[in-house]
Amino acid sequence: MFDSTASNLTSQQSWANLMQDHDAIRLLETTVLPPYLNSCRWFAGKARQQAYFRVQFAHEIPYRADAETSDQAFLVIVEVGYADGETESYLLPLSFVERAQPEIPPKGILTTALFDQKPGRIVDAIYDERFRRALYFNLVHQETLTQQSGQLRFHRGRGLAADDIDAEVSSRVLPVDSSNSALVFGISSQGEKYFLKLYRKLFQETNPEVELVSFLTEKSNFDHIPAYAGSVVWEQETGADVTLGMMQRMVENRHDSWNQTGDDLNDFLYAVPNRLFSVKEEVFERVELLGRRTGQMHLALYNSDPDEAAFAPEPFSDEYREFIIQRFENLLERRYNLLIDNYVKLDPLAQRLAWVFMEAKEMIDEFVDDFRNRPLESLRIRIHGDYHLGQVLVTGKDFIIIDFEGEPESSIAERKIKHSPLKDVAGMIRSYHYAVSAKLFGSTETAGIEPDHLQRVSERWFKLIRDTYLDAYLETIGSPHPLFKNNSEVNFLLLVYLLEKAVYELGYEISYRPAWVKIPLKGIMDVIREIEKIRIADPTRDSELPLLQVGLLQSKKE
C-alpha cells in the first residue's frame, strides 16, 4: 500500500510557482510519482518495466475568487517511459491543501509538503472541492485558459441546462475503481445532475467517446445516451488536440443489462429441473427493445451530410479489408499458440473444442480469403465499438447506452475506424452468449441440473434471445437500407465479426479464467458450423478442403 508519509517535499517557492523549483519537480518525478501511480487503479503500466516518470506539462487551473487558500491547481501531464522504449501519458490533477480535510481519502494524498514556509499536503485535486468547482465553472462558461503550451478550452454542450450555468453546485468523487475518474455535480433543489469523466490515460487525439456522444447529442434525435454537457480539451501549440475530460447528464438507473439478463436467466433456470421451458414475455419485450435501440443508434450514426466527414459512410475498401484481415490473422496466430501452450490445463470439453478449432484452421483461412475477395456493397460507419450488456443501463422500462470509448486494447486511431454496425451487433450477441454460458458452466443455480439437459435448454434460450434481438434490430434498420445490401451480406458480415470477437475473447479466458475457455470456443464452433452451411450451399464451391461436417464435427462429440 502506498504511504504518503514516506516522502516530504520542501520548496522555498509558493505552491503557485511549483514548476519553477526544479529540485521539487525532480523529487516528484523520482520519489513521489513512481510509487503513487503504481498504487492507482487507473495506471495501466504496473506490469511493465518502468524506466522513468517525467512531469511533461503542468496546466494551471485558477480557483474561484472566493477560494480560501492555494489559489490554483495543476493539471499535470505525466510521461511514463518504459524499458522497451515506449511511452504513455497520464493526467494527474494536483492541489495543495494546508490543513487536513476529512473528505480527502488516504489514496488521494501523494506526499506531505512545505511551500514558502506553509506546511500541507499535495493531493490528487479531484478530492479538493475547490478544483471540482473550478472545473464546473470553466466548463459551463466555456472558458479558454492560456497555458505555456497551448491552451485549455472548455466546451459546453446541449446537455447542460441554461438555468444551471450560474446555479449553486455541490460535488463529490464517485467511489468507483476504473481506468478513469468520475466526478458528480449536484444542482440545488434538483439533486445530482451531471457526471464528469476525467480521462487518466491520454492520447494525442480527440477521444472517440467525446466525438460520438457530442455528435449523437448535437446532431441527432437519439436520446438514449447520457446527453453531452461539455468537455475539456488541451489544444497544443503543435500537435493534435488532447481530450482531458467529458461531462454528461446523470441518468437514474436500476442496474446494467448484464445484471438484468442474469436475473432473467435465474427465473428461467428455476423451472428447468421441473422439465419446464418457459421464457417470460417481458424478457422478449426487453430484448426486442434493445434490438430497436441498437438499430436507432446506428441510424443516428449513419450520416450522409458532406460537412461531417468524420461520420460519413464509407465502402468496404481493399485497405479496410486488409486491415481487418491482418489484425485477425495476427490474433488468430497468437490464440493458436496460447491454446497449444495451455492445452493440458484445459478440461476435457474445452480440449475437444480447442482441437476442432485448431483442425478447422484451413477452413477459417478460406473464409478469410472469401472476406478479402467477395464483392461487398454494404457500408461502414462510426460505431459504439465495445458494445455489450454491461454498456446498457436499465432505466425503468427503457435503456441508456454508455461508454463509447471503444475497445480498451485498441489505439485511438483504431477506435475511430469505421466498421459495419454489425460489429456492434456481434458484440451484443456474444454478450448474451456469455450470460447464458456463465450460468451453464459456473453458477450455483444450475448445480443440480443434469448437464446434457442443461446444455440443450441453455442453447435454446440463447438462440431464441439472439434471433429476437437480431430480428428487432434489422426491422428497425429497414430494408432496403444503404447500410446493408441484402440478407446474404448481413449473414456473411455478422459471421466475420462474431468470429473475430470470439477469437479475441479467447485470449483473456486462457490467461485469466481457464475454466471459461469453453465459452468463446463454443462461440467459435457456432460460427464454424455456419461457415460450413455456406460452403455446402455454394454450388460454385471448388475448394479441395473436405466438408467439415463429413468428419470433424461428427467425430468429436461436444
Segments from the language model and where they lie:
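Short Lys/Arg-enriched alpha/beta "domain-start" segment
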Residues: 9-52
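Short amphipathic beta-strand and strand-loop transition segments with alternating hydrophobic
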Residues: 49-68, 77-79, 173, 231-232
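Conserved ATP-binding subdomain of kinase catalytic cores across diverse folds
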Residues: 73-337, 395-402, 407-459, 463-467
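An alpha-helical support segment within catalytic cores of ATP-dependent transferases
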Residues: 158-169, 334-381
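Conserved catalytic-loop position in the HRD/HxD motif
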Residues: 386
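Catalytic-loop Lys-Pro-X-Asn motif of eukaryotic-like protein kinases
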Residues: 389
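ATP/Mg2+ or Mg2+-diphosphate-binding catalytic cores
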Residues: 456-484, 492-557
